[in-house]
Amino acid sequence: MSELTTIARPYAKAAFDYAVEQKIIAGWQEMLVFAAQVAQNPDIKNLMSGAVAPESLAEIFNKICGEQLDQHGQNFVKVLAENKRLQALPDIAELFSEFKAEFDKEIEADVTSATELNAKQQADISAALEKRLARKVKLNCSVDPTLIAGVKIKAGDTVIDGSVKSKLNRLTDALQA
């Protein structure tokens, strides 16, 4: 876990709790994603690492974001600037998205297969994961021919490796033991 992630967690949690309370989770997620993109701009990064006063930095940042941030979003940026935490915005946005996924009972699953999966195979994998994890699953599919055959699935802390490559590696280890 990076230092910025540790710094970002309480800010992301506070923003998420506020968004839940006000029933504006999607709006806050959009604001944070936009602000994170602005914070990753090389010119803005230079500005944030310079000797600009926090009030001025917040004002400049909010002007750049324009109408993408509502009054509460602008206040959030001011608090981050005053505490010299604007550089944590990308991590804050990422953590906010994780909190939202947990709240919505959603999870992203990375599915790697030896060949491209068709729509039915993707639907079958998604349904099986939803049943096993008791969550709505969004698949991120990729192809890795080195798997030989089968699939490798990673969803949160759960890893399911049904690839031939993995089975061959286990067999090799067993024979060498």
UniProtKB/Swiss-Prot annotation:
The keyword NADP does not apply. One of its GO terms (cellular component) is plasma membrane. It comes from Pseudoalteromonas atlantica (strain T6c / ATCC BAA-1087). It is found in: Cell inner membrane. It holds the Pfam family OSCP. NCBIfam families: ATP_synt_delta, PRK05758.2-2, PRK05758.2-5. F(1)F(0) ATP synthase produces ATP from ADP in the presence of a proton or sodium gradient. F-type ATPases consist of two structural domains, F(1) containing the extramembraneous catalytic core and F(0) containing the membrane proton channel, linked together by a central stalk and a peripheral stalk. During catalysis, ATP synthesis in the catalytic domain of F(1) is coupled via a rotary mechanism of the central stalk subunits to proton translocation. SUPFAM superfamilies: N-terminal domain of the delta subunit of the F1F0-ATP synthase. It is a peripheral membrane protein. GO terms for molecular function: proton-transporting ATP synthase activity, rotational mechanism. InterPro entries: ATP_synth_OSCP/delta_N_sf, ATPase_OSCP/d_CS, ATPase_OSCP/dsu. Its main location: membrane. This is ATP synthase subunit delta. The keyword Transport applies.
